[in-house]
Amino acid sequence: MVSLVLTPLLAVRLMLPVTACDTSLPANIAAAAMQPQILALAQHSVSFRQQCQRIGRTRVLRVTVQLTGTIEGRGRAQTVIHRYDAGGLRAEVSLQFGADYVELLAHEFEHILEQVDGVVLRDEIGSGRAWRTESGAFETRRAFNAGVQVRREIDALTAEDDDAKRRAFAAPAQPRPRQP
């Protein structure tokens, strides 16, 4: 006979449904070498996890994330969106190898979600919510803010971890010599 004993926390976790981006990427995101970084980011940032899950729920969308040596126009990342007559979307995200991917991934995923939401980038220019870069690509305030938000979430966790590590690894206080 085999008996199984679960801790209460583990039992609760087993009862909760596993959602996309918890332990694996949604089927419509192909990330190859970037998969571990994307999953780690989704596990530690609520905002990025929501982006990832939203992309995963968009059936007409396919996303490819790849590393590259250089990005056109001196950028660190870019997303090229392809729209198909039947309504499908394909997003090709390129990240410069060795860059800090935290802010870049969230920023580029937000560009994808802008297109899912039907944002017309040319219309956004007049309101200041979008602009053209030197290379002619569009940039948006929404994507910029998404990247900054995820960066803040990760930095806050890192700061907490650093404080805990300092306390855990701090040298014990020296005992004071007794006075006679």
Specify the residue positions occupied by each region the protein language model found.
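Bacterial N-terminal signal peptides
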Residues: 2-14
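Intrinsically disordered, low-complexity segments enriched in proline/serine/threonine
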Residues: 10, 19, 28, 174-177
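Intrinsically disordered and other compositionally biased segments
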Residues: 11, 74, 169-171
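Auxiliary, metal-adjacent structural segments of Zn-dependent hydrolase domains
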Residues: 16-88, 94-99, 144, 149-157
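Short amphipathic alpha-helices and their capping/turn segments at secondary-structure boundaries
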Residues: 93-94, 107
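Post-HEXXH active-site segment of zinc metalloproteases
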Residues: 99, 115-147
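Active-site recognition of the HExxH zinc-binding catalytic motif
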Residues: 103-116
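Long, well-structured alpha-helical subdomains associated
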Residues: 144-180
